[in-house]
Amino acid sequence: MDLSAVRFDEKGLVPVVVQDARTGEVLTLAYANREALEETLRTRRSTFFSRSRQALWRKGETSGHTQEVVEVLLDCDGDAVVYRVLPQGPACHTGERTCFHRALLEGEKDLGFVVGQVYATIKERLRTLPEGSYVARMHHAGLDRILKKIGEEAGEVILAAKNQNPEELRHEAADLLFHLLLTLAELGLTPEDLAKTLWERHRPRSPYDGSHGN
């Protein structure tokens, strides 16, 4: 693996931003030396260098909250790295999902973030099936009931659009999306599977490859 483009600082370190590949949420800011970066690329597991312990730090080594690394990005100056990960549990030692859980300025959440969080909640409900949970109730009712609900919600979306009612359309479309996410989770698919398919269909094409995106 060629790390010649990485500009480590005078202590042999480079800052690493850890980002949830599903939601885009920033999880952690840590540091890596050459060995940690090499191990991350080799194992596809987040590995850092602890400045306090002066040793490699493998995320989840003691907590079990590992991070599968799906992509490693280097910034334009070569002096910062991004790990895009699929986290298995919270990133923060406090038990919070992200180390950046204290807002100084609260902002709007984008669609990718919200979809990722809703899907994660659905998966957790399907795993634990808590009493009183709508997801658990629909799961027990069976796939046919979920699919019937999708049909009902799709009809509501059509009616809202037909009536040119943006507010109603917004709510009905959200209901439809929720039940689509529930269906994906029931069948073992993820929003990333949809994103991959959409990207394959619509990504910019080279003028030399003989094909064109939609």
Curated annotation (Swiss-Prot):
InterPro entries (alphabetical): His_synth_HisIE (IPR023019), HisE (IPR008179), PRA-CH (IPR026660), PRib-ATP_PPHydrolase-like (IPR021130), PRib_AMP_CycHydrolase_dom (IPR002496), PRib_AMP_CycHydrolase_sf (IPR038019)
Gene Ontology MF terms in the entry: ATP binding; phosphoribosyl-AMP cyclohydrolase activity; phosphoribosyl-ATP diphosphatase activity
The enzyme's E.C. designation: 3.5.4.19, 3.6.1.31
Stretch list, region Phosphoribosyl-ATP pyrophosphohydrolase: 115-214
Keyword field: Amino-acid biosynthesis, ATP-binding, Cytoplasm, Histidine biosynthesis, Hydrolase, Multifunctional enzyme, Nucleotide-binding
Chief place where the protein resides: cytoplasm
GO BP term, pick one: L-histidine biosynthetic process
Reactions mediated catalytically: 1-(5-phospho-beta-D-ribosyl)-ATP + H2O = 1-(5-phospho-beta-D-ribosyl)-5'-AMP + diphosphate + H(+); 1-(5-phospho-beta-D-ribosyl)-5'-AMP + H2O = 1-(5-phospho-beta-D-ribosyl)-5-[(5-phospho-beta-D-ribosylamino)methylideneamino]imidazole-4-carboxamide
GO CC annotation: cytoplasm
EC class: hydrolase
Pathway: Amino-acid biosynthesis; L-histidine biosynthesis; L-histidine from 5-phospho-alpha-D-ribose 1-diphosphate: step 2/9; Amino-acid biosynthesis; L-histidine biosynthesis; L-histidine from 5-phospho-alpha-D-ribose 1-diphosphate: step 3/9
Protein family (similarity comment): In the N-terminal section; belongs to the PRA-CH family. In the C-terminal section; belongs to the PRA-PH family.
Protein name: Histidine biosynthesis bifunctional protein HisIE
Annotated source species: Thermus thermophilus (strain ATCC BAA-163 / DSM 7039 / HB27)
Gene that this polypeptide is encoded by: hisI
